[in-house]
């Protein structure tokens, strides 16, 4: 049987890695030949989950067409967030929980997008729908994905479905979701050894908002000041990326996972749109965003509206 590659977005987060592994597991149990792969380096939070549940990180790839004809996308659909040669392969399926944008195919496909907080929540349903048992280790990874995307159930993206799925998966994995989750998030929030280049690319996504090219990166921390004191270096790194990619705006969202607030650092010609979107005033290119923790639900929609006006 012809092999299929399953992967999430560039600059992978925990949901992207763990959902690729989980969906490949499900597809293989259903008789397919699927391999999970990744499009970037594994972050500290994800590595904690992989180590805890004794799972290998997926293989790193830059292109797919040299290996396979068909691919499955998880946790994304926008082409600029996907593999470099996405135009040269057939997208067979998409399992996602984000907006649909900049996406079209020449052939029909299976597309499943649900307004939940995490791709793994959808996959939990799909295991049940196919009467396939979720193994302990896979359940642990799926739980990790939900905890990550929902910031331990505190994010406004988190739904009752996510909470219910996490409860089921924690039971299968044999862990206390709150205790394990806090340890995992803290592992991801240790930024002390990261270079500024790593910080701004750990969880960065490029968007086309109206006619503007915007990159939004998010980092989690337990102390915003630890990141803010590196602001001169960060601004230089952001400006470099803006020049290289011809961006109109680079927005770095520094999220305090304990206080559930974020600091915005905005660089670029469209930085004033951040002020408009959040009704704040940028001082030295930064502004506190009270209660903002979700890029998907609290940043992208309002920034899209501000840029469109």
Curated annotation (Swiss-Prot):
Its EC number is 3.6.1.1. It catalyses: diphosphate + H2O = 2 phosphate + H(+). One of its GO terms (molecular function) is manganese ion binding. It is found in: Cytoplasm. SUPFAM superfamilies: DHH phosphoesterases (SSF64182). It is an enzyme of class 3 (hydrolase). Mn(2+) 2 binds at residues 15, 75, 97, 149. Gene3D superfamilies: DHHA2 domain, inorganic pyrophosphatase (n-terminal core). Binds 2 manganese ions per subunit. Its main location: cytoplasm. Its cofactor is Mn(2+). Mn(2+) 1 binds at residues 9, 13, 75. PANTHER family: BNIP - RELATED (PTHR12112), MANGANESE-DEPENDENT INORGANIC PYROPHOSPHATASE-RELATED (PTHR12112:SF22). This is Probable manganese-dependent inorganic pyrophosphatase.
């Amino acid at each position: 049987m012809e092999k299929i590659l399953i992967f999430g977005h560039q600059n992978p987060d925990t949901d992207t890695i763990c959902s690729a592994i989980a969906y490949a597991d499900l597809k293989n149990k259903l008789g397919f030949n699927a391999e999970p792969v990744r499009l970037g380096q594994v972050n500290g939070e994800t590595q904690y989950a992989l180590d805890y549940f004794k799972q290998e990180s997926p293989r790193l790839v830059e292109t797919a067409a040299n290996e396979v004809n068909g691919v499955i996308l998880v946790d994304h659909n926008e082409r600029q967030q996907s593999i470099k040669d996405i135009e040269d392969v057939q997208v067979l399926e998409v399992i996602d929980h984000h907006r649909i944008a900049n996406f079209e195919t020449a052939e029909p496909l299976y597309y499943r997008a649900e307004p939940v907080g995490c791709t793994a929540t959808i996959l939990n349903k799909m295991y049940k729908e196919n009467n396939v048992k979720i193994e302990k280790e896979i359940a642990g990874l799926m739980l990790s994905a939900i905890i990550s995307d929902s910031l331990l159930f505190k994010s406004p993206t988190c739904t009752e479905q996510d909470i219910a799925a996490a409860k089921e998966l924690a039971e299968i994995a044999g862990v206390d979701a709150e205790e394990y989750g806090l340890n995992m998030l803290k592992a991801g929030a240790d930024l002390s050894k990261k270079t500024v280049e790593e910080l701004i690319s750990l969880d960065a996504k490029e968007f086309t908002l109206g006619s503007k090219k915007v990159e939004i990166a998010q980092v989690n921390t337990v102390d915003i000041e630890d990141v803010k004191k590196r602001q001169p270096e960060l601004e230089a790194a952001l400006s470099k990326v803006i020049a290289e990619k011809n961006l109109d705006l680079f927005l770095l969202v520094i999220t305090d996972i304990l206080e559930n607030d974020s600091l915005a650092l905005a660089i670029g010609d469209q930085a004033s749109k951040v002020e408009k979107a959040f009704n704040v005033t940028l001082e030295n290119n930064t502004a506190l965003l009270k209660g903002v923790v979700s890029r998907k639900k609290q940043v992208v929609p309002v920034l899209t509206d501000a840029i469109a006006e």
